[in-house]
């Protein structure tokens, strides 16, 4: 429901007979910005927004970081937040969000806002004091300290269900077993004591660690349903052991460690693996062979994933696995997402995954920025134009494959080669096709930022695919 719809309803007198308690429930479903706007609709609505149960203060909506008087704007923003909560009429709140970058000069205001949330028995608390300009841990780690520490009153709050703290210090030992929220997200801080947090967290169902540094963690265990580890820096190379028998969503993005898996849910719903932080390489070496074995073994422990998303680095390295014990085994994956440059150095990795996904129904190519590597040269005997014809037949494809999706489609020959093969094999251009895959459609999503000349190339490629598609639908989405 949007602000315009509510305004239209009021004009037609559709809401005038509803009691205030229901109107408050309705406006609590709006974004905080739209909720505030309802105060100008009519006299009756003037103060209803003061009882919304979802409050969100975002500095970026109030302060233009490019203006000369940024300091005075931040002072005004802090005063606005304190004034707003001082006039709040409700007894309880569901959510309080504070997005205020490095508020070192406003600590008293921030603490009073948090105390307000605790007094209203908040369920979901977001404290994000990171700088929007930070793009990596190296940007944030230059600060020797975090200016805001989580107040003592938060640790004992029994109503808290979800806590997000970015660039905000906290003491894991102060959370008792019964007081830790079910969902915890930590980011943009030096984090050295994760294991003590996990040892005392039987109620924790979702843990997200993002852009932290100095991490020392060797065992990740618990009854969690969701685990996210994104773009963190470790204090040293280490063995990282996972014991997550009930996890349903698993996302790991960052450095390659010596991964060990004790237990993993064999019916896991969603797995995302991203090792692009390792960079790119053109020549194989002893390190890449070792990492190929590590990642192949890691995939085997995650082979129950219904949806699996992988990165170019994984596609390139898993083909280098030489240890028979770690060679890729058949997986249960039904939706495979390949984040790829469609470079020849990734082709064998793509084939390995296709060969080991016998239940695959949807194949997605998520194509992102091209590298400086040449797309016309071969890579250890793999040719960019001939590989798909020489190394794949209809027998290589999962018999269950129904949908192929291409995101950021550009119509370049690398994309067209693999799509031509998939379409031709799916529509019956191969001998013995009656036992082959049953491809139903190909979905092409163009990038809205493409130049006109690039768009023309993509249009030509899409038309060519449509001309050979037969019974296979080729759908083009041009934003």
Swiss-Prot record:
The keyword Membrane does not apply. This is Putative F-box/LRR-repeat protein At1g56400. LRR repeats lie at residues 99-129, 139-167, 186-211, 228-254, 287-312, 342-367, 419-446. Pfam families: F-box (PF00646), LRR_At1g61320_AtMIF1 (PF23622). Keywords: Leucine-rich repeat, Repeat. Residues 12-60 form the F-box domain. InterPro entries: F-box-like_dom_sf, F-box_dom, FBL13/AtMIF1-like, LRR_At1g61320_AtMIF1, LRR_dom_sf. It comes from Arabidopsis thaliana (Mouse-ear cress).
């Amino acid at each position: 429901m949007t602000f315009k719809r509510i305004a239209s309803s009021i004009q037609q007198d559709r809401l005038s007979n509803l009691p205030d308690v229901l109107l408050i429930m309705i406006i609590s479903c709006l974004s905080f910005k739209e909720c505030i706007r309802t105060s100008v609709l009519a006299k009756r609505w003037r103060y209803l927004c003061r009882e919304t149960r979802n409050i969100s203060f975002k500095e970026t909506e109030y302060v233009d970081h490019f203006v000369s008087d940024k300091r005075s704007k931040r002072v005004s923003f802090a005063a606005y937040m304190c004034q707003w909560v001082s006039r709040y009429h409700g007894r309880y709140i569901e959510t309080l969000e504070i997005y205020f970058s490095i508020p070192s000069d406003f600590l008293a205001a921030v603490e009073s806002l948090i105390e307000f949330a605790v007094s209203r028995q908040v369920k979901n608390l977001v404290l994000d004091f990171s700088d929007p300009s930070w793009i990596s841990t190296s940007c944030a780690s230059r600060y020797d300290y975090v200016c805001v520490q989580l107040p003592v009153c938060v640790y004992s709050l029994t109503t808290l269900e979800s806590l997000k703290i970015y660039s905000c210090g906290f003491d894991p030992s102060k959370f008792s077993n019964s007081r830790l929220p079910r969902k915890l997200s930590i980011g943009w801080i030096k984090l050295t004591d994760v294991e003590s947090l996990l040892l005392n967290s039987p109620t924790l169902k979702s843990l997200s660690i993002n852009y932290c540094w100095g991490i020392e963690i060797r065992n990740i265990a618990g009854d969690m349903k969701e685990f996210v580890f994104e773009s963190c820096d470790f204090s040293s190379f280490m063995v990282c052991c996972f014991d997550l028998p009930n996890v349903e969503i698993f996302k790991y993005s960052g450095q390659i460690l010596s991964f060990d898996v004790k237990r993993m849910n064999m019916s896991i719903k969603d797995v995302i693996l991203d090792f692009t932080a390792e960079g790119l390489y053109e020549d194989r070496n002893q390190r890449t062979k070792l990492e190929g074995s590590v990642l192949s073994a890691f995939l085997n422990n995650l082979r129950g994933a219904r949806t699996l998303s992988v990165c170019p680095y994984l596609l390139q390295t898993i083909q280098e696995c030489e240890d028979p014990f770690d060679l890729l085994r058949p997986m249960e994956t039904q939706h495979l997402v390949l984040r790829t440059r469609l470079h020849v150095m990734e082709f064998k990795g793509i084939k390995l995954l296709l060969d080991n996904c016998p239940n695959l129904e949807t194949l997605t190519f998520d194509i992102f920025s091209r590298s400086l590597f040449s797309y016309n040269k071969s890579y250890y005997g793999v040719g960019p134009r001939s590989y798909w014809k020489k190394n794949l037949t209809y027998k290589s494809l999962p018999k269950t494959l129904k949908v192929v999706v291409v995101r950021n489609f550009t119509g370049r020959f690398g994309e067209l080669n693999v799509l031509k093969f998939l379409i031709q094999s799916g529509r019956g251009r191969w001998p013995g096709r009656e036992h082959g895959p049953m491809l139903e459609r190909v979905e092409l999503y163009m990038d809205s930022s493409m130049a006109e000349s690039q768009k023309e190339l993509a249009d030509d490629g899409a038309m060519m695919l449509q001309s050979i598609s037969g019974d296979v639908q080729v759908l083009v989405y041009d934003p």
